[in-house]
A protein has these predicted regions:
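N-terminal leader/targeting and accessory segments in enzymes
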Residues: 1-95, 99, 277-279, 300, ...
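Residue-level signal for inorganic ion chemistry
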Residues: 42, 61, 96, 114, ...
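Acidic, Mg2+-coordinating active-site environments of NTP-dependent enzymes
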Residues: 76-80, 175-178, 192, 201-356, ...
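Walker A (P-loop) phosphate-binding motif
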Residues: 98-145, 149-152
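Conserved nucleotide-sensing/catalytic segment adjacent to the nucleotide-binding pocket
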Residues: 157-187
């Protein structure tokens, strides 16, 4: 991180109250929303959460050396000269972090974002495998964990807070001379809350949309609009490439910016014409195989992943990679080398004379797809344990 004066750092933010004059000339060296992470010269962001008011930790942050407190709420008594009130704290954190970390997603870092109800995790793992096959130093962020180069971390949120992402991006770029790339799940919560505000995505991928998170969004149309934010660009240029699932009726409605190159994909004969298509699909206990029809020609693909629904995930990753310009040889290699994703129609083998799979089916549509995929393997019986 570089040091920047507060006046310069907040120049583009929507303030909720005038800035205290004594704050303007202070030099910021870092930023965080966790008061336990604050160091001298840093800014503390006090989020107003559903259960916890971040202002309760403002004094702790000041004692740790914070030079300013940022909040959407009014200052606590006695802290007026340290307070910066903003209209949207998470968007402000994202923009301040972007400046302090010198804007990596607008420069050397290639950022691939995957949104949708189902298939995000598997698509991200496939993308990471393809990027590695193409020679990138790769980071991965998703529901079941984060990976920065060779370092593996437990995940707290599907999409981390903005400053955490920038910290991880910085570590990834520091440990290699190869070009860095990140494949990450981008949840509707993250898009609505502003966690990726100001980040430029080289490629944005749409998997599908089914009923989920309606308690947060209030309805399917609001849920759809939240997902579409990834393709509009939030205080950043729209994605260079959009990889859209044309098998999904909602995907065909996603707004694409004039500057974005559309690469669509499909596997159903009834779907509209698409840039990339899967034909001659075969599924079995060894995985899936199909012919990948692309603008560069038709290529045979095989993956150890089980279930026809994974063909759509493979298509999403392959289309995103091809749209970005990754050679088909690296795409095929990455798909073939990508192992079973933990908890995603994952094979469990302890020597039993039958197939067991475990799947994180968190929606009714996902459960239907899993049972359909199991039946397509032509077993004598399918036993489902759900809980």
């Amino acid at each position: 991180m570089k040091s920047i004066g507060i006046a310069e750092l907040i120049a583009g933010l929507e303030l909720g109250a005038p800035l205290a004059p004594e704050l303007a000339s202070r030099l910021a060296r870092g930023v965080h929303f966790d008061s336990r992470r604050i160091e001298p010269g840093w800014i503390f962001f006090a989020f107003a959460g559903a259960n916890v008011d971040g202002r309760n930790f403002a004094l702790q942050a000041i004692e740790a050396g914070a030079i300013a407190i940022v909040s959407e709420l009014a200052p606590l008594p006695g802290l007026e000269s340290n307070w910066i009130q903003v209209k949207h704290a998470r968007k402000a954190l994202a923009l301040v972090s972007r400046s302090l970390f010198e804007n990596p997603t607008h420069g050397p870092l290639a950022l691939f974002g995957v949104t949708g109800t189902n298939g995000k995790t598997t698509t991200v793992y496939l993308l990471a495998s393809i990027l590695e096959a193409a020679g990138f130093e790769t980071g991965l962020f998703g529901t079941i964990g984060y990976r920065i180069g060779k370092q593996i971390l437990a995940s707290v949120n599907t999409t981390p807070e903005s400053v955490e992402l920038y910290e991880h991006f910085s570590h990834l770029m520091a440990e290699t001379s190869r070009r860095p790339a990140v494949a990450m799940e981008v949840s509707s919560h993250a898009l609505s809350l502003g966690r990726v505000w100001g980040m430029h995505f080289a490629v944005a991928i749409w998997t599908n949309l089914t009923r989920d998170h309606l308690d947060f969004h209030g309805g399917m149309e609001s849920y759809f609009e939240a997902k579409c934010e990834l393709f509009r660009g939030q205080d950043a240029a729209a994605p260079d490439v959009a990889a859209i699932n044309f098998d999904d009726e909602h995907g065909r409605r996603v707004p694409i910016a004039a500057s974005t190159r559309l690469w669509s994909f499909a596997m159903r004969e009834s779907s509209p014409p698409s840039t990339v298509r899967a034909i001659n699909i075969q599924t079995g206990f060894a995985g899936v195989g199909f012919d990948l029809v692309t603008p560069q020609g038709t290529f045979q693909i095989h993956s150890p992943l089980l279930g026809e629904f994974n063909v759509s995930n493979i298509l999403a990753a392959a289309t995103a990679a091809l749209g970005y310009g990754i050679p088909i040889e690296a795409v095929r290699e990455g798909i073939e080398k990508c192992p079973s994703v933990p908890g995603r129609f994952e094979r469990v083998d302890v020597g039993q004379p039958f197939l067991i799979v475990v799947d994180y089916s968190h929606t009714d549509d996902a459960i239907r797809n899993v049972i359909r995929a199991a039946r397509a393997l032509n077993p004598t019986r399918v036993i489902t344990v759900f809980g």
